[in-house]
Amino acid sequence: SEQSLHRDTPVFCTSPGDRYMGVWTALDAVDDSNGPLRVVPRSHLLPPIDVQALRRKVFGDGPVSAMSPEGWTAYQDAVARQCEEAGLQPQAVHVQPGDVIVWHPQLFHGGAPHPSAGTRRSVVMHVTPKSMPVGHMDVFYGQTPSAEKAPWRYYRRGRREIARFGQVDFGHEYTRRTWFLRKA
């Protein structure tokens, strides 16, 4: 989907930090005609943003909600300025079906416009170690302490343990129950 350049960390914040990876698997061939993933190479190596100073600037002494549009925009704008000052430019990533892109939590990335009628189907996941607590903006900006352990239960598939969430949700306006995935 078309998305402005961003880092996932404000809405996918782990403690200790950066203990996850983004994984994007192409189901269709993707080029400039159907909205490729855009990445800013080396943006994950930039110095950290002072999120406490940013919190004071955006929220003052007020509360920070788990999904704050103001907190999201302020952070992403700060990262964009850092990338520009460092001379880093976004690059489109063209892929074939089955190609997998794995990225660091601090990599600035987004989805380019999709000008054609063609599809750009993909599967996107964020993967953490087992029991890794994940917080949102209230944790990212330091208002809410990070949980010591993730609250979800796991089920076993062979030697793997998979978190049981029950719904697909990443702070979007919608959630989707996962029972329909089991019918296939």
Question: What do these predicted regions represent?
Answer:
Residues S1-V40, H44-L46:
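Conserved double-stranded beta-helix
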Residues L5-D8, D77-A86, T119, D138-Q143:
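Short, surface-exposed loop/helix-turn segments at secondary-structure junctions
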Residues R7-P10, W24-T25, G87-Q89, L107-G110:
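Glycine-rich, charged/polar anion/phosphate-binding loops
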Residues T14-P16, P36, I49, A112-H114, ...:
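Short, function-defining helix-loop hinge/capping sites that tune catalysis or transport
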Residues G17-Y20, R55, W72, R120:
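A structural signal for well-ordered alpha-helical scaffolds and beta->alpha junctions
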Residues G22-A26, P90-A92, V100-V102, S122-V124:
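Conserved hydrophobic/aromatic beta-strand scaffold that supports enzyme active sites
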Residues S33-F108:
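Double-stranded beta-helix
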Residues L54-K57, P97-V102, Q106-A184:
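Non-heme Fe(II)/2-oxoglutarate
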